[in-house]
């Protein structure tokens, strides 16, 4: 399983609908291929609570290690990915909702005074919710209450969820507006990073050179390497290999030969594909097919 995305890395999945733009679900990180969901973004705000295990959650150029009973606020339109940590299974609660669910209609006081100052602030792509911080505990508790309401679906569950999300937002708003500025990437840098990731997503099955990627975002090769490594905590080559292996998994499961799969995901040598596959998956392509 993997997240479905458009060419620009935007997630295709609907998070609720126009009349009630909220989605609540319990996910398992190990359900995703390689124990990771790939980089994507969506206009919805996302709240995460770790129910068991651990996860590395990356948002733009920041990395957060989330343990059981900790959580994360992920802002609207941020590029993010999640990676399993250790051998234990990791289950987490995900609550996604569109900002308009908070403010109602464009240019309202709620939007301009309380929502936009947070969702449009590039300094706050995310922040961690600690289980031992009183204010954070309250937010995490409200998140759990939302899940319970979602599961039971009382007759007024939409109203109850709206009230709890407004309480959560009030806490988040006060927290963000009272904190000193953080050193985060600018909107232009985020746009460049999205373009680089999207380019590899669109061309992973072709021969891609550093020149191609640098030219696509209009920077020199050395700056291209430095920029990607700084913000993604991995080299361009490492990300491309990771992406290609991810793309190979459903093909192998469908019964494609190793040789054909290698070519379909951008490897010119089946032997090299097998070598990289084993590095990431700890087994050969044939062993993966059998299991």
Model-derived regions, located:
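Generic protein-terminus/edge-of-domain signal
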Residues: 1-71, 77-79, 86, 110-113, ...
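Short hydrophobic/aromatic patch on the recognition helix
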Residues: 69, 223-228, 272-273, 277
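Ligand-binding loop in jelly-roll beta-barrel domains
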Residues: 77-102, 110
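Amphipathic alpha-helical segments enriched in hydrophobic/aromatic residues interleaved with Lys/Arg
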Residues: 108-167
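N-terminal positioning helix adjacent to the helix-turn-helix/winged-helix DNA-binding module
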Residues: 135-138, 142, 164, 188-196, ...
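Solvent-exposed, amphipathic alpha-helical segments
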Residues: 138-152, 192-203, 247, 251
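Hydrophobic recognition helices of helix-based DNA-binding modules
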Residues: 150, 169-172, 176, 200, ...
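Terminal helix-turn-helix DNA-binding modules in bacterial transcription factors
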Residues: 198, 202, 207-214, 219, ...
């Amino acid at each position: 399983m993997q997240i479905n995305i458009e060419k620009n890395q935007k997630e295709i999945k609907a998070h609720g609908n126009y009349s009630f733009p909220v989605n609540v679900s319990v996910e398992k990180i190990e359900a995703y291929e390689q124990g990771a969901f790939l980089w994507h973004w969506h206009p919805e705000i996302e709240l995460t609570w770790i129910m068991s295990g651990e996860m590395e959650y990356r948002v733009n150029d920041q990395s957060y290690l989330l343990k059981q009973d900790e959580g994360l606020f992920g802002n609207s339109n941020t590029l993010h990915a999640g990676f399993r940590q250790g051998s234990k299974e990791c289950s987490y609660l995900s609550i996604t909702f569109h900002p308009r669910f908070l403010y109602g209609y464009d240019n309202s006081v709620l939007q301009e005074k309380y929502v936009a100052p947070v969702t449009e602030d590039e300094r706050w792509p995310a922040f961690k919710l600690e289980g031992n911080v009183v204010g954070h505990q309250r937010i995490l508790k409200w998140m759990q209450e939302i899940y319970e309401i979602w599961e039971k679906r009382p007759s007024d569950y939409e109203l109850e969820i709206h009230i709890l999300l407004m309480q959560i937002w009030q806490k988040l708003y006060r927290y963000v507006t009272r904190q000193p500025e953080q050193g985060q990437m600018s909107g232009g840098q985020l746009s460049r990073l999205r373009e680089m990731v999207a380019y590899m997503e669109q061309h992973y099955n072709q021969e891609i050179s550093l020149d191609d990627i640098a030219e696509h975002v209009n920077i020199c090769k050395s700056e291209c390497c430095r920029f990607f490594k700084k913000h993604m905590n991995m080299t361009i080559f490492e990300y491309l290999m990771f992406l290609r292996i991810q793309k190979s998994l459903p093909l192998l499961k469908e019964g494609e030969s190793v040789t054909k799969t290698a070519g379909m995901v951008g490897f010119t040598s089946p032997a090299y594909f097998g070598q990289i596959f084993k590095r990431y998956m700890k087994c050969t392509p044939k062993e993966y097919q059998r299991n």
